[in-house]
A protein has these predicted regions:
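Generic low-complexity, intrinsically disordered sequence content enriched
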Residues: 10, 21-23, 39, 46, ...
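Alpha-helix boundary/N-cap detector
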Residues: 3-14, 18, 86-100
């Protein structure tokens, strides 16, 4: 198995990265805000590697946009004692759908 395949599989199991991959496939873009400084670290991006870097470095607000509509705004705390914390401020159906699919997949893997 290739190293790149293993990396993708590991990222798939991380909730915050899985969320980004899921919504990128749906044609969404992301804005990332650093909670510490309040600054926008990434705006209107669909570049997975740049989004991953921005949300892996610190606690962030992640805005998910589709066709100029705010799908949701989530609070991301990566690697919170080994478990990603994702809080959906908008309680959106789209995030609920992703969450249900992600939880079912993780149950099947364990």
């Amino acid at each position: 198995m290739k190293i790149e395949t293993l990396k993708k599989a590991e990222e798939f199991k991380q909730g915050h990265l899985n969320l980004v991959q899921y919504f990128l496939k749906k044609g969404c873009k992301f804005t990332v805000k650093d909670l510490g400084s309040g600054a926008v670290s990434l705006a209107n991006s669909s570049n997975y590697e740049r989004i991953k870097k921005a949300i892996n470095e610190y606690d962030t607000h992640l805005e998910i946009w589709k066709d100029d509509r705010l799908v949701s705004k989530v609070w991301i705390i990566p690697y919170n004692e080994g478990i990603d914390t994702i809080a959906d401020y908008y309680v959106s159906k789209e995030i609920d759908d992703w969450s249900n699919k992600f939880e079912k997949t993780m149950e099947q893997l364990n």
